[in-house]
A protein has these predicted regions:
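Aromatic- and kink-enriched transmembrane "portal" helix at the membrane-lumen/periplasm boundary
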Residues: 4-9, 60, 64, 71-74, ...
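Membrane-interface transmembrane helices that cradle and orient dolichyl/undecaprenyl
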Residues: 89, 124-146
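Membrane-interface alpha helices of multi-pass inner-membrane proteins
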Residues: 94-95, 107, 142-159
């Protein structure tokens, strides 16, 4: 609920407008303009935003709603990760803190890739934990594939995921 309250209260700002601009372009044009303009943002969020805008429209509320979706999923996955590591009680506390954490709420209200990178990083960590716990057992190639997808999604959303 915190992520949706006043979602369209502020006007779209420069970075959000730039993401919407790139999201409306085809791959080739987006890459060409990105290189010429010196844009350093990876493409995954903008590609997802383009698909989202075809479904939900391009109003400030609808374009920001994608970030809300990613932010809520990140909290749910964080709960799952913490539950496997520390149990249900700690997981509930971790999820509650993440649900109200000001930076996570704030960035879930912008048409930017930050909630996606958080979601993908938590998903990647959860999959890594599952792979690590299967050291003595035959590892699933599907699990490795999902780990690779989650990690590439994180890096494709923001280069800081490499850190």
């Amino acid at each position: 609920v915190l992520r949706v309250v006043r979602l369209d209260y502020r006007a779209l700002w420069w970075d959000e407008g730039r993401n919407i601009f790139f999201a409306r372009l085809d791959w080739v044009s987006a890459a060409e303009i990105s290189v010429r303009s010196g844009d350093t943002n990876p493409p995954i969020y903008r590609l997802l935003l383009g698909g989202w805008m075809q479904l939900a429209g391009a109003s400030p509320f609808s374009v920001r709603l994608l970030s809300v979706f990613f932010g809520v999923l990140a909290v749910a996955l964080l709960y799952r990760l913490a539950a496997e590591l520390y149990g249900e009680r700690v997981a509930a506390i971790a999820a509650a803190l993440a649900a109200v954490a000001p930076p996570l709420v704030y960035y879930s209200q912008e048409a930017k890739g930050y909630p996606l990178v958080v979601l993908a990083a938590v998903w990647s960590a959860w999959l890594w934990l599952r792979l690590h716990r299967r050291l003595g057992v035959a590892r699933s190639s599907a699990l490795w594939a999902w780990f690779g997808i989650a990690t590439l999604l994180a890096v494709g959303a923001h280069y800081f995921a490499l850190l």
